[in-house]
Structures are given as C-alpha cells and as structure tokens.
Design a protein with these regions (language model features):
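Bulky hydrophobic segments
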Residues: 1-88, 92, 96-118
Length: 118
C-alpha cells in the first residue's frame, strides 16, 4: 500500500509540475478560476504526500513549502509563465491544508484500528 501511495503522490506531483511549467496551452482550465485550480491541485498534492509519508510530518511540510517556492521561481524562466507571490501563498497554504487532512485521516484510521481490535 505504501508503494502505491508514494507512486500516486509522484504522479500527482509530476502532473502539477507539468501544469505549472509546461506550455500554457496544455494547462487544464476549469470554472474554479486560477486560485481555485491552484488550491485544488495543491490540497490534493498535500493530501497525497501526507498519506505517502505519514511519519515525517514537519519535514514533509517544510520540504513541500520550499519546493513550491522553487516551482514558483522556476516560472521566471518558463515562456508564457509568471511567478506571483499570491500563487506561492495559495499553493503553500493549501498544500499544508492537505497535509493536515492526511494527518487527520491517519489519526482516524489509527483510532478505528484500535477500537476494532478491542
């Protein structure tokens, strides 16, 4: 199960990196708008990474925020892309929301397993 969670997280991260740095014409668009799309993508990334690496919560959060910052900076060299502080804040905060969601799910699963064994 751990391998599947990590593989899923890697695929999701790769998709977000491509959507962020790839040609703008290939970026998916939705009725959520730019901030909504960013929020959804990074909540899912945070959730996936948090489920894939549940024992290193603070390290995963710190690395996630740092890599999100790097991803935003890399847009300075991507044609047709732009780096914005607002995007970094939305992406970092929503990734952390996803990480908290993963921690809550882990806590609930542990409680459920504990009550099922009694």
């Amino acid at each position: 199960m751990k391998i599947l969670l990590r593989l899923g997280a890697a695929v999701l991260i790769a998709a977000v990196v491509f959507a962020t740095l790839g040609p703008p014409r290939y970026r998916p668009h939705s009725p959520l708008g730019q901030d909504g799309e960013h929020a959804l993508a990074f909540v899912l990334v945070g959730l996936a990474v948090g489920l894939a690496f549940p024992r290193r919560k603070l390290l995963v959060a710190a690395v996630s925020v740092a890599l999100i910052g790097l991803l935003e900076i890399m847009q300075l060299w991507a044609p047709g892309r732009h780096a914005r502080l607002e995007d970094f804040v939305v992406d970092a905060v929503t990734a952390c929301v996803g990480l908290v969601g993963a921690a809550v799910l882990g806590w609930l699963a542990a409680r459920w397993r504990g009550s099922a064994s009694q």
